Regions:
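Short, glycine-/Ser/Thr-/acidic-enriched flexible segments
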Residues: 13, 33, 68-70, 171-173
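Active-site/ligand-binding-proximal alpha/beta "capping" segment
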Residues: 91, 166-186
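Feature captures the catalytic cores and cofactor-binding loops of soluble hydro-lyases/lyases
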Residues: 34-35, 39-162
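Short, structured beta-strand/loop micro-motifs enriched in basic residues and often containing a Trp
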Residues: 3-12
């Protein structure tokens, strides 16, 4: 029997993310941000230059998604996750400055996992191939930075019960590695 999903609402605190463990089913509601590799590169460059970011990272969640155009009556087009390793070069710097969660698909680098452990952040997986269903969880979307990047612009999303699973927790655990162990032949 599966337990009820855990409900969270950003901004998240250290205490919020410390409660989460790999395999937890989570429903996220409230405000999150979108960003992919081109936007991450720009955020990283701003940090290197000592400049302010276009939004406050503290306690926030970034969803690695590039939406398709929204259909009439929808706030957002398809909202399927992007492969996360493309953000790995930039993520440790963002985590160090207060980012508490990332949503994507696929494994993360050791450097990202170490940053999550050190600065208390988590990585969630959203279901790949379910972009149309995930889009229904987006109630409002607005571009807040880098409009010139088109689908890769940073958007502020208002979401309601976006379903995700904890893949990496603050203790350094990795659901992909632990899951594989169950089925490995010794």
């Amino acid at each position: 029997m599966m337990s009820e999903p855990i409900r969270i609402k950003p901004p998240l605190t250290d205490r919020d993310v410390e409660k989460l463990k790999i395999g937890d089913r989570v429903l996220i509601s409230g405000i999150i941000y979108t960003g992919r590799d081109a936007a991450h590169r720009r955020l990283f460059d701003l940090l290197k230059e000592g400049k302010d970011l276009p939004f406050d990272l503290k306690g926030q969640i970034i969803y690695y998604v590039g939406p398709t155009p929204a259909k009439p009556g929808q706030a957002f087009g398809s909202a399927g996750p992007t492969t996360s390793y493309r953000m790995d070069a930039y993520s440790p710097s963002l985590i160090e400055r207060g980012l508490k969660g990332m949503i994507g698909k696929g494994m993360r680098s050791d450097a990202v996992k170490e940053a999550m452990k050190k600065y208390k952040a988590v990585y969630f997986a959203a279901t790949g191939g379910a972009g149309a269903l995930l889009a229904k969880r987006v109630k409002k979307a607005e571009i807040v930075a880098y409009e010139d990047l088109g689908p890769e612009a940073i958007r502020r999303l208002e979401i309601d019960d976006l379903p995700v699973i904890v893949v990496n927790d603050v203790r350094g655990n990795d659901l992909y590695i632990e899951g594989e162990k169950k089925y490995r032949k010794e």
